[in-house]
């Protein structure tokens, strides 16, 4: 027989063999399914006897799981004959395990009565851990936020609001007051001189856009024509695109020691958002939430004395507080979830319409989500997720901006009030600002697919592929013949910008569990990740129109355009081994190796090692009985922060010379040795529970040092470059502590009382600048990054002539003096929840201490002659008194540095759950009515409207100044949530 003939026979035999095997498998599959049974269980709260919804029941060692419905019932079908352990868990409760046995197609039943717990060592988490693992095995600190619990307490508008004061070490505060405005979101302080301080955010394993600053000036167009901020310092926040009602929980990795496996973008921590999923063996379960209410600024604008004065034409000056309105709010969400034996679904749709307290300003947002899962076999799970968002914002003009609406109203002089400028506006009439049209329109699709393969109970594989695609358009229109600057009347302008952003995520994680010895288990994780981000900005501006009614850029007499593009790619590999010594001691060792397109050409891959240990002492018999849980832990790890996409490149900027002849000039000098900033963090702490876990106490201390921090080094003029060269020569120390106490003070019958106390402190210091001399005072060795400095007063003379030509006057030092850090060094929050029967009351109070800010509004307002602290000292005829002259001349010489310390009633609510007997004929499930307030009242000494204001948006590094910004409003809501 020829070789070809022999090969044909072998192929034929192989085909027959595999065909028979496939046929037998297909024939056996129905028989196997015929021998499967069902597990049915009920889950209740041991303290109240009420059913627990959304608890997860898992057949240990398999992928078979289900979630409980509103009656606390779960059904798991397709369970093969045998003996199993069923594990039931829910955030806020101690998990329970029960044994069941199935013979053939029997039905096994189990009942679970869960106990509320202030400590959750057995809670399963997945972010940064190399696979799903109980918290008892982790040696670093992690925060988990249960969105269902948050929404039962208060109606939230966005995810940033939901995270505020919920996790120690996480700062989430509103820095602007308009609808859709950004928040400052950061974890454990500051670890860089110039790079973004926002944590990396993932949604169901997919990296997403979190931009929270204006994006227009990146095109370089501003040197061609007066352009091109759209809303001044006010910025939108892409995290606001998310629908809080779609979220199940949020996991927060607080620092480098915990986030090592995320590599070169994880220095600032990692936030992973998990959206809701369907339920196996569940008929369609509908949820409906409707919320109405309003936003209203606190009437504490410092212009209450304005109406006491009249202008030169007899116009009575207006108080800026008269601009405050009730901004209506409405939000509607509907969702359905369910599934069969091997498939589940969750789908939702939402619509929000929010108007600002200062008009014109609104946000209109529509969301749609579809999450599907399918188990084609017992070994494969396929999950698909998709979110579509359309978000339109009429932006408020605010923040270091000639056309800032409140800024013009508050910084006027009431003695200059006219019919056109009733606030005595120094720059732009408020009436003209209200005619401006500033919009942000974003369309966003975020989705992905995850494949889970479990060839054996001890061997799992997970592959995730996802995309975040954001298309954003911004526009600003100045109508013809309005006054939009100190120069007077303009002939109109239109700014138009487009931003296209996408982020691809590809992630693989394998995990193999095996026994080294009888009581020593190894959980070996391995995998890789590829990320690619791209951002393109296109800007056009048209200036000077022929007349009213013209608004197209192309119709303007003067036009200009600009474009910017950036792309960054990361590929990383990881390996980790977690050793379990019985149920008491766990040790983890791991490493991530990264390559990044932003690394210098002379720099290769970066290695990030980690190690942690967790010791559960409460498993030992010698522990006192009142200590129900006790884990001590320690961790050390590295994470990085990659440079900007083009920082390593030598670049040139195009210029027109010699009457339009194109040319180039040197721009960025580049650096082929540029490498990531690297933070090494050491952390230690404990988690403990007392009295059957009714009292939970957790504490952590951490010390982090950032090396290779990027510093801009000025080059000699002979080098010919316009900008400084980025070099890795800096070092920053960042250290702090965190503590929390959760106490189920009363859990008896109809009455419950739960209290939560969270405390944290943080300090940072510049250690080294590598000999580089920086301009300004914000970065100084031995002081905090972006510390606040000022020129102090050195003398006072009652007869010396000041800036207004009158006495008294002051003298100041020529040397800057350190005033304080820009971020709080101490944060605290105290939350209390009281429940009596179907009635629940909740309140959350927060405190911030230790920070200062540049209160530029205060001296500026005085120099304009319109600050209440100046007006109160004027004589009855309007002439300045000696005290008024003193105030005026002081603030003509000095900048104001004021305290950011404040105590705030951040959240308060009253909820009522309608008794089931009233709903029996309506087919409705659990129905709750909630009246709530956010940002209700605060106490401060800042001589400002709100100490948290920041004119430059939510991620504006190094800015601690509320100049012309708008404060966050009070928010009042009435919500109803029901299921059917």
Regions found by a protein language model. Name each.
Residues 552, 659-667, 705-729, 756, ...:
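Surface-exposed, extracytoplasmic segments of Gram-negative outer-membrane nutrient-acquisition systems
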Residues 56, 60-71, 125-156, 180-184, ...:
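N-terminal periplasmic "start-of-domain" segments of outer-membrane beta-barrel proteins
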Residues 161-220, 248-254, 259-278:
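Extracytoplasmic beta-strand/coil segments of soluble accessory domains associated
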Residues 203, 314-337, 342-348, 352-355, ...:
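Outer-membrane beta-barrel transmembrane strand signature
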Residues 310-337, 479, 483-586, 636, ...:
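Outer-membrane beta-barrel transmembrane domain signature of Gram-negative proteins
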């Amino acid at each position: 027989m020829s070789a070809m003939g022999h090969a044909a026979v072998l192929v034929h035999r192989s085909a027959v063999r595999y065909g028979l095997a496939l046929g037998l498998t297909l024939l056996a599959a129905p028989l196997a399914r015929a021998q499967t049974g069902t597990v049915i269980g009920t889950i209740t709260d041991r303290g109240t006897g009420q059913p627990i919804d959304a608890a997860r029941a898992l057949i240990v060692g398999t992928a078979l799981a289900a979630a409980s419905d509103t009656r606390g019932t779960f059904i798991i079908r397709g369970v093969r004959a045998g003996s199993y352990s069923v594990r039931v868990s829910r955030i806020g409760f101690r998990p329970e395990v029960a044994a069941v046995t199935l013979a053939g197609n029997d039905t096994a039943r189990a009942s679970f009565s869960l106990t509320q717990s202030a400590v959750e060592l057995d809670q399963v988490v997945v972010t940064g851990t190399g696979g799903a693992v109980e918290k008892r095995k982790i040696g670093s600190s992690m925060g988990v936020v249960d969105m269902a619990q948050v929404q039962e307490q208060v109606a939230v508008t966005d995810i940033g609001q939901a995270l505020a004061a919920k996790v120690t070490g996480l700062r989430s505060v509103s820095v602007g007051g308009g609808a859709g405005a950004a928040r400052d979101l950061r974890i454990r302080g500051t670890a860089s001189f110039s790079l973004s301080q926002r944590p990396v955010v993932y949604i169901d394993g997919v990296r997403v856009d979190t931009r929270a600053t204006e994006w227009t000036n990146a095109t370089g167009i501003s040197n061609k024509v007066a352009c091109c901020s759209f809303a001044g310092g006010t910025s939108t926040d892409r995290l606001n695109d998310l629908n809080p009602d779609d979220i199940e929980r949020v996991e927060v990795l607080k620092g480098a020691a915990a986030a090592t496996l995320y590599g070169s973008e994880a220095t600032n921590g990692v936030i992973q958002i998990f959206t809701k999923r369907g339920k196996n063996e569940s008929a369609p379960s509908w949820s409906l939430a409707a919320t109405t209410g309003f936003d209203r600024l606190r009437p504490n604008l410092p212009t209450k004395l304005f109406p006491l004065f009249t202008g030169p034409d007899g116009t009575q000056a207006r108080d800026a507080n008269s601009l405050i309105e009730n901004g209506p709010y409405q939000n509607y969400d509907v969702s359905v979830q369910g599934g069969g034996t091997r498939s589940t679904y969750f789908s939702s749709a939402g619509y929000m319409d929010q108007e600002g307290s200062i008009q014109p300003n609104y946000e209109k947002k529509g969301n749609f989500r579809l999450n599907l899962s399918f188990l084609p076999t017992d070994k494969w799970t396929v999950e698909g997720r998709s979110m579509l968002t359309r978000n339109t914002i009429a932006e408020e003009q605010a923040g270091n901006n000639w056309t800032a609406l409140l800024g013009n109203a508050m910084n006027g002089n009431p003695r200059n009030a006219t019919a056109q400028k009733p606030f005595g506006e120094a720059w732009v009439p408020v009436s003209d600002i209200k005619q401006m049209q500033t919009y942000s329109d974003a369309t966003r699709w975020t989705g992905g697919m995850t494949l889970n393969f479990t060839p054996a109970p001890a061997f799992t594989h997970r592959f995730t592929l996802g995309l975040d695609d954001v298309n954003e358009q911004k526009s600003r229109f100045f109508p013809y013949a309005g006054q939009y600057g100190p120069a007077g009347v303009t002939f109109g302008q239109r700014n138009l910008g487009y931003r296209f952003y996408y982020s691809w995520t590809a992630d693989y994680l394998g995990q193999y569990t095996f026994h080294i010895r009888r009581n020593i288990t190894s959980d070996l994780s391995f995998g890789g990740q590829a990320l690619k981000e791209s951002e393109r900005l296109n800007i056009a501006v048209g200036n000077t129109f022929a007349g009213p009614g013209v608004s197209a850029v192309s119709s303007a007499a003067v036009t200009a355009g600009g474009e910017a593009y950036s792309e960054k790619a990361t590929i990383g590999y990881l390996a980790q081994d977690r050793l379990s010594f019985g149920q008491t001691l766990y040790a983890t060792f791991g490493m991530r190796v990264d390559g990044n397109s932003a690394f210098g050409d002379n720099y290769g891959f970066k290695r990030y090692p980690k190690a942690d240990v967790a010791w559960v002492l409460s498993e030992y018999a010698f522990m006192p009985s009142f200590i129900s849980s006790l884990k001590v832990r320690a961790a050390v790890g590295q994470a990085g922060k990659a440079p900007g996409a083009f920082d390593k490149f030598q670049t040139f900027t195009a210029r027109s010379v010699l009457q339009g002849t194109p040319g180039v000039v040197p721009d960025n000098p580049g650096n082929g040795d540029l490498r990531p900033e690297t933070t090494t963090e050491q952390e230690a702490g404990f988690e403990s529970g007392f009295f059957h876990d009714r009292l939970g106490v957790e504490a952590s201390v951490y010390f982090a040092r950032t090396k290779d921090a990027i510093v801009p080094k000025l080059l000699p003029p002979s080098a010919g470059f316009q900008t400084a060269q980025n070099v890795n020569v800096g070092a920053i120390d960042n250290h702090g502590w965190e503590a929390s106490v959760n106490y189920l003070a009363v859990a008896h019958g109809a009455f419950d009382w739960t209290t939560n106390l969270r405390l944290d402190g943080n300090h940072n210091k510049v250690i080294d600048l590598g000999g580089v001399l920086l301009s300004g005072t914000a970065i100084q060795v031995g002081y905090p990054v972006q510390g606040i400095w000022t020129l102090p007063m050195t003398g006072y003379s009652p007869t010396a002539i000041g800036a207004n030509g009158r006495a008294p006057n002051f003298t100041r030092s020529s040397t800057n003096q350190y005033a304080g850090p820009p971020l709080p060094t101490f944060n605290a929050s105290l939350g209390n929840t009281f429940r009596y029967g179907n009635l629940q009351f909740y309140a959350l109070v927060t405190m911030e201490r230790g920070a200062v800010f540049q209160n530029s509004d205060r001296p500026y307002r005085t120099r304009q002659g319109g600050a209440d602290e100046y007006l109160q000292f004027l004589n009855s005829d309007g002439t300045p008194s000696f005290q008024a002259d003193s105030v005026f001349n002081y603030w003509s010489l000095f900048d104001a540095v004021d305290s950011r310390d404040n105590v705030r009633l951040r959240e308060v609510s009253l909820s009522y759950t309608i008794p089931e007997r009233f709903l029996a004929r309506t087919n409705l499930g659990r129905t709750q009515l909630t009246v709530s307030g956010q940002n209700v009242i605060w106490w401060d000494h800042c001589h400002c409207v709100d100490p948290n204001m920041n004119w430059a948006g939510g991620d504006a590094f190094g800015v601690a100044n509320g100049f012309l910004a708008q404060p966050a409003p009070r928010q009042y809501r009435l919500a109803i949530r029901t299921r059917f």
